[in-house]
Amino acid sequence: MRNLVVGVVVGLVIGVVLGSAIVAPRLKLPAHKTFSQEQDTNITKPASRFVSAPRSKRKPAPVHWRMASAYASQMPQMGEQAQRLDNSIWHLSDGVFRLKMYEPGTLVPSNQMVDAVRSQAIDAAFAAPSFWAHKNPAFHLFSAIPFGPSAQEYLSWIFDGGGREIMDELYNHQGLHGLVCGIIASEGSGWFRDPIESLEAFKALRIGMGGLGGLVVQQVGAKTMNLNEGDVFVALKKVMIDGAEASQPAVDMDLGLHEIARHYYFPGWHQPATLLHLIVNGDAWLNLPKSRRAQIDAACASNVAYGLAVGEARQFNALREFTKHGVRIHTWSPDILLPLEKAWTKIRVELGKGNQDFKRVWDSLTKFREEYAIWREISAGTPMQN
């Protein structure tokens, strides 16, 4: 029996050897596949060690638009926001769209920007809407309003209180599309050579101030000169004016106004907040891809947030620096401030009578402010008056 078992085992071994060494090669098949060999039959091996990535679509040729700015690129805040808009859109579009900023007067004079955009002589402009309020006084109310809303309240009305809808209508009538694309919060009221002790002393002054604030100053009896921020220093130095407003303390520091006038007045009643707009030709805007319009919207929203945050953060250091140079910081006497506010009321009533758009904008803003005041008092913990 033992010999029989040994014989069977030897026979099986010889059979396996013969099958593997002789039969299988003739059939050109492996006698047995390992697990790894089984897997290899289902894998297509690359021809080389490196597999090239699929070729991406070619980036479209960059589109370049020309944007006239009312503010020099080196000017803090206003010029800074214009340059920032240029950079932001370039990066958001991945280098496909460029809204190139041009310095004031390079493309067209600043007071001709709106006509140049409308005729497509240039592609866009960046400025406060007061620069084109000669087309419609209602644009003043989307720029800066004497004794008007704070920056927060202003933006709330624009974006969620009915302001934007009216603004869009006004721009459409001009063949334009406009976006709120920057902001300056509360400013200083002005720089003066001497302290101003009375309304009579104020009336005798020559003041560099434009916009609605300039109309108010004229109404109380003072003389005004409409100046760009960059021209204020020269006008003060040459004694062409007795005082002037420019912007926020950090901007005024850069302009060097403290070197000439030592009396700095607050509050900035004429411009509690100033909106900066980007305007483009209406047809050109509609012809942009939706993605491009969304990028411009996003860049403008970012600019507004930046302008508000930075504009508030920088002012204390500027004021501290002014005091080191002997500047005296004043607040207006009620004997001067109240007559200015009454003068503004008279002016805005007259403007409303002569322009239905102005009245419609003012009524919308007034209604919003009345309702907003209730929330502001409650949220601030201020006792409400019955």
Explain the meaning of each model-derived region.
Residues 2-154, 166, 171-386:
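N-terminal secretory/targeting leader peptides
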Residues 161-162:
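Core domains of carbohydrate- and sulfate-ester-processing enzymes
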Residues 157:
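Short beta-strand-centered segments that line the small-molecule binding cleft or hinge
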